[in-house]
């Protein structure tokens, strides 16, 4: 199959999740942008990564499957650690199915979470911006996002509180006896997670919240957005809060013994102690929620099976459109070349009407031969192709076809 067409068997997923390597080790499998750029030169195809707090996945579209073994070896070398041995490798339809499950919130630490849809969109946009991916992976990711939305509309998989951060806030509410408005809360980190926690706490009625961050200006920006306070990073001060949310990277382990509850969403975990809840603990809460959504999970799996078949049909349409475009471009190239040649000849015989007619006749004959000779040669060797051409001939047997029908045929 030509490289411009999509072959579902060329999709590959290299998967590490909280299930396969554990949350505490997951960060070791995150691939940096610089590493991806080096890897791109080693494979003929496209690359995109999806890295969240509960997964590190690399998606490939490769034109040469033999290169994949070398790719894994180079991945280990460039990463500086043998991570390929921990990978779950999925190919073709299995890779597509997995991404559809991820997009639908089925393969998540928090079943039914919405956040993954935004993460998928940002992942493919980033890989395109870095020059790592193009149409093939974009086609897959866009379809996955579409499937994810459809599953949520047709099932109750996302009913109730979903998302790992929502679970964290719910746990904090439980510990505070649903009186979170009067609790002294610290959020350590003013990045994406810190922002989300601040918004959720604001919506739950929290009032006494302070944002701590290494860069004070960033903490102040988040605090001002939600009407909270801001402080530079200071664990001595943080230790005096009732509930603490932590979402930063820190190269040392610390203890915060005074708070009633510390929810550490950092990867890897940085806070130690009996008062600490981690992503791993939240996973057990998520598992209990999953038990209440068994019917939705089953329905979602059935829908995904249908959507995979729909995806295959979308690939057929994609390839048909590419084939038509390729065919029409070739015809246009021939047409332009013949017009230019005929025009040059006509200029030589501007006053000879019979000769001009002869030139036009030769031009059209030449065009027909160049367009259809390769096709007819294939027909002679292929009975199925001959039957196909015969069907086309029957459709056009009256000698013409309306413009509207032509457009309709092109769309199909």
From Swiss-Prot:
Name its pathway: Porphyrin-containing compound metabolism; protoporphyrin-IX biosynthesis; 5-aminolevulinate from L-glutamyl-tRNA(Glu): step 1/2
In the record, what terms sit under GO molecular function? glutamyl-tRNA reductase activity; NADP binding
Fetch the CDD domains from UniProt. Answer: NAD_bind_Glutamyl_tRNA_reduct
Provide the binding site for NADP(+).
Answer: 189-194
Q: What else is known?
A: During catalysis, the active site Cys acts as a nucleophile attacking the alpha-carbonyl group of tRNA-bound glutamate with the formation of a thioester intermediate between enzyme and glutamate, and the concomitant release of tRNA(Glu). The thioester intermediate is finally reduced by direct hydride transfer from NADPH, to form the product GSA.
Q: Please provide the Gene Ontology terms (biological process) for this protein.
A: protoporphyrinogen IX biosynthetic process from glutamate
EC number, as in UniProt: 1.2.1.70
Catalytic residue list: 53
HAMAP family reported for this sequence: Glu_tRNA_reductase
Q: Which UniProt keywords apply?
A: NADP, Oxidoreductase, Porphyrin biosynthesis
* Stated role: Catalyzes the NADPH-dependent reduction of glutamyl-tRNA(Glu) to glutamate 1-semialdehyde (GSA).
What is stated about domains? Possesses an unusual extended V-shaped dimeric structure with each monomer consisting of three distinct domains arranged along a curved 'spinal' alpha-helix. The N-terminal catalytic domain specifically recognizes the glutamate moiety of the substrate. The second domain is the NADPH-binding domain, and the third C-terminal domain is responsible for dimerization.
Q: In chain numbering, where does the site feature Important for activity fall?
A: 98
Q: What class of enzyme is it?
A: oxidoreductase
Upper classification of the source organism reads:
Archaea, Thermoproteota, Thermoprotei, Sulfolobales, Sulfolobaceae
User: Catalytic activity annotated for this protein?
Assistant: (S)-4-amino-5-oxopentanoate + tRNA(Glu) + NADP(+) = L-glutamyl-tRNA(Glu) + NADPH + H(+)
Spell out the protein name for this chain: Glutamyl-tRNA reductase
Q: Per its UniProt record, what InterPro entries does this chain match?
A: 4pyrrol_synth_GluRdtase, 4pyrrol_synth_GluRdtase_dimer, 4pyrrol_synth_GluRdtase_N, GluRdtase_CS, GluRdtase_dimer_dom_sf, GluRdtase_N_sf, NAD(P)-bd_dom_sf, Shikm_DH/Glu-tRNA_Rdtase
Q: Could you say which residues bind substrate here?
A: 52-55, 108, 113-115, 119
> What does the annotation say about its assembly with partners?
Homodimer.
Q: Which family is it part of?
A: Belongs to the glutamyl-tRNA reductase family.
Could you tell me the superkingdom of the organism this chain comes from? Answer: Archaea
């Amino acid at each position: 199959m030509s490289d411009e067409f999509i072959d579902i068997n060329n999709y590959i997923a290299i998967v590490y999740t909280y299930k396969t390597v554990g949350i505490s080790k997951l960060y070791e499998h995150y691939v940096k942008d610089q590493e991806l750029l080096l890897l791109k030169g080693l494979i003929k195809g496209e690359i995109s990564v999806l890295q969240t707090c509960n997964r590190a996945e690399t998606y490939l579209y490769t034109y040469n499957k033999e290169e994949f073994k070398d790719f894994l070896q180079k991945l280990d070398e460039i990463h500086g650690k043998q991570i390929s041995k921990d990978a779950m490798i999925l190919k073709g339809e299995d890779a597509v199915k997995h991404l559809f499950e991820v997009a639908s919130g089925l393969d998540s630490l928090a079943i039914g979470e919405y956040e993954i849809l935004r993460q998928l969109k940002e992942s493919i946009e980033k890989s395109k911006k870095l020059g790592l991916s193009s149409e093939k992976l974009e086609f897959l990711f866009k379809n996955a996002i579409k499937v994810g939305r459809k599953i949520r509309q047709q099932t109750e998989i996302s009913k109730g509180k979903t998302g790992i951060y929502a679970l964290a806030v719910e746990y904090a509410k439980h510990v505070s006896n649903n009186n979170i408005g009067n609790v002294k809360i610290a959020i350590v980190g003013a990045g994406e997670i810190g922002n989300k926690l601040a918004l959720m706490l604001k919506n739950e009625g929290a009032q006494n919240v302070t944002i701590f961050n290494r860069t004070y200006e960033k903490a102040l920006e988040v605090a001002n957005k939600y009407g909270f306070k801001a402080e530079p990073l200071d664990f001595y001060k943080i230790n005096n809060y009732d509930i603490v949310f932590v979402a930063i990277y820190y190269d040392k382990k610390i203890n915060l013994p005074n708070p009633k509850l510390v929810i550490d969403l950092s990867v890897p975990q940085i806070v130690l102690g009996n008062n600490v809840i981690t992503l791993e603990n939240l996973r057990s809460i998520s598992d209990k929620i999953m038990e209440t959504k068994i019917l939705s999970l089953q329905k979602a799996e059935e829908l995904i099976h249908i959507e995979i078949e729909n995806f295959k049909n979308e690939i057929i349409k994609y390839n048909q459109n590419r084939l038509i475009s390729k065919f029409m471009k070739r015809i246009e190239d021939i047409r332009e070349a013949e017009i230019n040649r005929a025009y040059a000849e006509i200029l030589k015989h501007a006053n000879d009407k019979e000769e001009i007619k002869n030139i036009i006749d030769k031009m059209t004959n030449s065009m027909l031969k160049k367009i259809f000779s390769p096709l007819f040669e294939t027909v002679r060797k292929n009975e199925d192709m001959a039957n196909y051409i015969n069907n086309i001939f029957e459709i056009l047997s009256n000698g013409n076809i309306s413009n509207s029908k032509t457009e309709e045929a092109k769309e199909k």
